[in-house]
Structures are given as structure tokens and as C-alpha cells.
């Protein structure tokens, strides 16, 4: 499945907008995720964590991966910038807003807008964007309590797309609280038990090594539940 091109020089630098096809990545890292796509397409949810120290290019790699998945594999990709977030409710708000603003599948977007019509407002003058209204705790709490059902319903609207790939960029703040560890572990367990082979979805979390170790140890994940992809060297 590795049919994309890797170039000799990375054009990524702060403030430099480039074509994703020019990205120089670590081919083995990208392949370590892509090789699981057949499982995801069959409805088996997968969870990955990309670890590396600050400045290692984790965000750039996730951007490139998003491009590859959308362009070559008919996957919907959603990326959440999660820096500084330390609670699950804020994470869910950012996920819903990212879905509303970035999903290119009209039927899925319409379904989301219908479901959340009482909780959504538009902001901006040039290019309107959707956001969740400040007083929406009841909605966010209900999604947090039954996140597997939310994901299952999301996947039911894929139509001609093969899967959804959600990138949560930076879980370092969330790793500070046991509530996230417990919530995500419960989500992983229940998604598989309740909706086995019904949810073609994958998650990629990015983290510093020490924070991932804390989450893995506290959550007692097994090797089949979360796949760790170690990014030890920066891009050059």
C-alpha cells in the first residue's frame, strides 16, 4: 500500500506553507499506520500514539499523514489542535467543532448540524465558522458519558468514504489528569465490546514519551489496544 513519494529535502519550516506531497517523512512510521488500514476498513477501530520530544516534527508528520489518507485511501481525516487542554469536555467541544468546520462529506455535515442545531452558532465575517455555544454542558456531558455511541453514529454516515481518522495533536495537558486516562480506556474497551466491526475509525494521539508512559501505565492498555509509534529523530 506504500505508493506515495518521499522527497530528499523537507520544505517544512515555521511559517512556510508547502504542498504536502513535498514532505520528507520517515517511511517506516507512515507505513506502521497505513498497514492497519485494511483492519479499519473492516470496522475494527485502531488507536495509535505518536511519541517524540518537542521539535521532532510530530505535527508535520500528522499533517502529511492526513494528506495521504485523504488523497489515496478515501479516508475522512479530522485534526484537533489540543495544546493546553486538560479536560475531556474541552476536547469533545474541539472535536465537534473540527467536524462541523472541516468535514467535506455533505451528508455527514448536515447530520451533525441537525443533531446539534440547538447548540451551534456561527462566528466570523469573512468565511463563517461553526462553534459550540458556551452554555452547552448538557450536550457535552452526554457525549462524554457515551462516547462510543457518538462515534458509532458518526461512522454510520460515511457513505462512499472508507473510514474516519481523528488526530488529537498534543495530549500532554490531558495526561496530567487521571480522568482522561480512565475515560479513554473505558472508551477503547466499550467501543470494541459494543460495536465490534461496526466502526471504521482510527485515532492518532501525539505526546511526549513520559506523558504517554503515564497514560499507558495508569490505563493498563494491552499491546492490541494502542499502538505506539516512536519518533526518535527530528526531520532533516
At which residue positions do the language-model features occur?
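A short, basic N-terminal segment
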Residues: 1-48, 68-71, 211
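The catalytic "switch" region of P-loop NTPases
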Residues: 1-2, 15-18, 160-167, 171-236
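Short, solvent-exposed loop/helix junctions and linker helices
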Residues: 23-27, 85, 234
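Short, well-ordered amphipathic alpha-helices
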Residues: 32-37, 65-66, 151-152, 184-191
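P-loop NTPase nucleotide-binding core
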Residues: 44-180, 201
